[in-house]
């Protein structure tokens, strides 16, 4: 469990081993930080169904990989938002992006 922007996220999980749940919510793509057990967010996104969202096909995947060096250094953390609307998830994503200013998010506010 990790807290980002006041929200509890499950994980971080190694991206290659992550089994995406059939749930909606927010996600953070992360790499290990400089200190033990710390992580740095590269990207925040939202999905109507995590299980339908293959992050290896994301347009920014190659950039994330260039930072991580290998997919074994890419992690994902998720915050499930059952019964959420796309607009609600997008607003939450914008808030996280404005707070953290990750390198590869489109909405840097």
Predicted regions and their residues:
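Coupling/hinge elements of helicase-like and P-loop NTPase modules
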Residues: 102-109
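A broadly used, surface-exposed interaction patch
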Residues: 52-73
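Canonical phosphoinositide-binding patch of PH/PH-like domains
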Residues: 75-83
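GIY-YIG nuclease catalytic motif and its immediate N-terminal context
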Residues: 1-55, 83-98, 102
């Amino acid at each position: 469990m990790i807290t980002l922007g006041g929200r509890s996220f499950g994980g971080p999980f190694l991206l290659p081993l992550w089994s995406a749940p059939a749930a909606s919510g927010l996600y953070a793509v992360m790499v290990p930080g400089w200190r033990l057990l710390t992580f740095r967010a590269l990207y925040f996104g939202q999905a109507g169904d995590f299980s339908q969202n293959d992050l290896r096909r994301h347009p920014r995947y190659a950039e994330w990989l260039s930072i991580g060096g290998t997919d074994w250094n890419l992690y994902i953390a998720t915050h499930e938002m059952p019964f959420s609307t796309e607009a609600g998830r997008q607003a939450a994503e914008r808030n996280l992006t404005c707070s953290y200013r990750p390198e590869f998010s489109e909405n840097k506010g």
